[in-house]
């Protein structure tokens, strides 16, 4: 029987995180982005970025977590989440800075072949626990308008659109996004 758990990412996880990001983007976004854009994503470049995000985070409130599936004979890194204080990348065009108590999810991906096993939910729950520790009371995340799976996943956890939108320029093609938000209860829900 497999066991899933979440832990803080370590610098040596950067390569696996980059591989998951690349695989997931090429699978989930293949109808959203031009094929040549996805084909030209550089795994080594992504790994260097993740190594820096893990090893030299801008603050103690910037975190990268990984989901691990532990089987009888091996363990596999199957997903990751990155978050921190909401910065300029969390903003809609011409929006003023968000308050200091707002967190932002920058990435939350589970490799498709490991989906539907609770890894995304565990990553999100662990992230919310850390937000509570860090004093965040609100969180935001951007989702592509065509990414129904991410929107449905976040909605199932209580997130909803906040009315903000933007479009990313991907090789002269505008890809619309909408922002979702959630209030963070300062106390975790009671368990039976």
Give the residues covered by each predicted segment.
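Acetyl-CoA-dependent GNAT
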Residues: 8-11, 22-32, 38-115, 121-126, ...
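Conserved catalytic-core motifs of GNAT/GCN5-like acyltransferases
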Residues: 88, 140-143, 155, 160-177
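Terminal substrate-recognition subdomain of acyl/acetyltransferases
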Residues: 2, 156, 170-192
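Conserved GNAT acetyl-CoA-binding A-motif
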Residues: 131-143
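Hydrophobic pocket/interface hotspot
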Residues: 17, 21
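Conserved active-site alpha-helix within GNAT-family acetyltransferase domains
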Residues: 121-122, 133, 145-163
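Short amphipathic helical patch at the helix-1/turn junction of helix-turn-helix
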Residues: 110, 144-145
